[in-house]
C-alpha cells in the first residue's frame, strides 16, 4: 500500500531497537493503550446508563436514539424550540435542530412544544426515536403525548424531565420518579 503511494518506490521500515527513539515508541504504545482503555470504559459507562434507563422506564430494550425537546424564550417573546439527539448515549450534534415558533402565542410553552413536535413528526424521512424526552413536567408530558397520538406515533415512549427537581414524569403515573443525582440513568437524561 505504501509502496503504491510512493510511485512504486521501495519502502524500508525501521523499528528502533534501542535508544531515545525506542523509548519514544514505547511511550507512544503506552499512550495509545491508555486511550483505548479509557474509550472502552466510556462506552461501557454509556451502555450501563442506557440499560439502567431502560430498566427504570420499563422499556423493552435500551434506547438507541433519544430525542430531547426544549422550549426557550426571551422574556416571553422570541420563542424557539430545540431538538437534541443522542445515539447510543452519545450526543450527535449534527442531528440537532432549532425550530422558530411560528403559530404558538408568545409564552405558551405547551403550544410551542406541540408545534415543534408536530413539525418534527411530520417529517417521515427522519429516523424514529426510541425515546422522546421533553423538558418540563406533567403539562409538557401531556402535550407531547397528545401530539404523538395525533401523529400516529402514540406507541413511542415519552417522558418529561423536570430538571430543577430532578424528577421524571412517566405516562400513567401520578407521582414523578425521583432518582438519586448520581444515578446513571438520570445523569444520561440530564446531558
Regions found by a protein language model. Give the residues of each.
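Acidic, glycine-enriched active-site microenvironments
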Residues: 1-191
Amino acid at each position: 500500500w505504501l509502496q503504491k503511494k510512493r510511485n512504486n518506490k521501495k519502502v524500508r521500515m525501521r523499528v528502533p531497537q534501542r535508544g531515545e527513539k525506542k523509548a519514544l515508541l514505547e511511550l507512544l504504545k503506552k499512550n495509545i493503550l491508555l486511550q483505548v482503555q479509557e474509550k472502552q470504559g466510556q462506552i461501557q459507562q454509556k451502555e450501563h446508563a442506557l440499560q439502567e434507563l431502560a430498566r427504570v422506564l420499563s422499556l423493552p430494550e435500551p434506547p438507541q436514539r433519544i430525542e430531547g425537546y426544549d422550549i426557550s424564550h426571551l422574556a416571553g417573546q422570541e420563542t424557539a424550540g430545540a431538538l437534541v439527539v443522542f445515539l447510543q448515549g452519545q450526543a450527535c450534534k449534527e442531528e440537532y435542530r432549532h425550530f422558530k415558533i411560528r403559530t404558538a402565542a408568545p409564552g405558551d410553552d405547551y403550544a410551542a412544544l406541540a408545534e415543534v413536535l408536530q413539525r418534527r413528526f411530520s417529517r417521515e424521512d427522519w429516523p424514529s426515536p426510541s425515546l422522546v424526552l421533553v423538558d418540563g413536567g406533567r403539562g409538557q408530558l401531556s402535550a407531547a403525548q397528545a401530539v404523538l397520538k395525533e401523529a400516529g406515533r402514540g406507541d413511542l415512549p415519552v417522558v418529561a424531565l423536570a430538571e430543577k427537581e430532578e424528577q421524571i414524569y412517566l405516562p400513567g403515573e401520578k407521582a414523578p420518579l425521583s432518582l438519586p443525582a448520581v444515578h446513571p440513568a438520570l445523569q444520561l437524561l440530564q446531558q
